[in-house]
Amino acid sequence: MKIDYTLYLVTDSHIVNRQELYKRVEQAILGGCTMVQLREKDISSLDFYRQALELKQITEKYRVPLIINDRVDIALAVKAAGVHIGQNDIPVSVVKDIIGRNMLLGVSVTSLNEAEQAVKDGANYLGVGAIFPTKTKKDAV
């Protein structure tokens, strides 16, 4: 499957509660979203897994890739299209060894050096740091 990175949605349950999440993700896909990343920092592994399963059904229905933030285990368990990691997570090369060539690997970077290293180590795409401050990224440039 050719991946379309045009409009990449990152979920945030601090902005949209869980009851609304599934409906909002489906609306986003119908509105042109081409990729969805499930990003949860404050829930249990079991809740994260259950949420991922629910979102996988929605994204699969529309043939939109589901990316799991930080959690390689959950990405593998739900057969997500890929995983997205940051600079303080397991090294890119190790994650790539775990997930293999058939899953996507995205990496958040904040410098040219980090970007070059991530690509060298096997990243399929890069997430470049926040430009404007948000509720979760107050130190944006």
Give names to the regions the model predicted:
Residues M1-D89, D97-N124:
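Conserved N-terminal beta1-alpha1 strand-loop-helix module at the mouth
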Residues S93:
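Active-site phosphate/pyrophosphate- and oxyanion-stabilizing loops and adjacent acidic/basic residues
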Residues V141:
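Active-site-adjacent C-terminal substructures of enzyme catalytic domains
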